[in-house]
Amino acid sequence: MAREDVGAPPDHLWVHQEGVYRDEYQRTWVAVVEEETSFLKARVQQVQVPLGDATKPSHLLTSQLPLMWQLYPEERYMDNNSRLWQIQHHLMVRGVQELLLKLLPDD
């Protein structure tokens, strides 16, 4: 089975509302936390979501996910708290573009 090319991952992901992010092309991405033993993962899928007004960061519920991710060298993202997230995979899953990000431990 041929693997579908998904291109480059988004350069930026900004939180729009709880669990929903926007990229630099205004596409929406839904993020879900996956906790495994001692590390945190985020499954982020590019899904069309109708957007209302953006939620103010101070009004967001407490979340383990950041307000923003920015693409960083070596297949990683840096979040607004200066934490690094490794891109575990970036592929198409049943026609949906998906990123799996793993929070790296502090050095």
From Swiss-Prot:
Not found at a significant level in any tissue. GO terms for molecular function: protein kinase binding; protein serine/threonine kinase activator activity. GO terms for biological process: intracellular signal transduction. It comes from the Eukaryota. One of its GO terms (cellular component) is mitochondrion. Enhances the phosphorylation and activation of AKT1 and AKT2. Belongs to the TCL1 family. Interacts with AKT1 and AKT2 (via PH domain). Does not interact with AKT3. This is Protein p13 MTCP-1. The lineage of its organism: Eukaryota, Metazoa, Chordata, Craniata, Vertebrata.
